[in-house]
């Protein structure tokens, strides 16, 4: 996971830090809140959504920073790190699961290979 912000807005300099997070039970949300708590960094949840598109929109608009999986962070967003006062995030486990009924489907086989290739390239 990585912290992301908009290159047009220095949101990461604000205190408390405005943060966009996923729903309450999300591992991504827990990782973000845990990281900020370990740093003693004051933060305020300003956007809450289960939608990746919503998280990205909140960051693009300069509303907040967000913790996203590296493979879902669009290249036009800025990856933030220690030089921005943001500490590391806990890794998130990712699994690709397919049903027995999908065995032998060329379309599912292709999608399965593509997902695995994408995750490997992202270092997951």
PLM region descriptions:
Residues 22-23, 45, 68:
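Thr-Gly-centered strand-to-loop micro-motif
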Residues 15-39, 104-106:
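Secondary-structure junction motif
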Residues 42-51:
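Short beta-strand-to-loop elements that line the ligand-binding cleft
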Residues 54:
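Short acidic active-site motifs
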Residues 39, 80, 118-122:
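Solvent-exposed amphipathic alpha-helical surface segments
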Residues 85-124:
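A late-sequence structural motif
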Residues 57-101:
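Beta-alpha-beta core module
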Residues 1-24, 91-100:
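Hydrophobic/proline-rich hinge and linker segments of small-molecule sensing/allosteric domains
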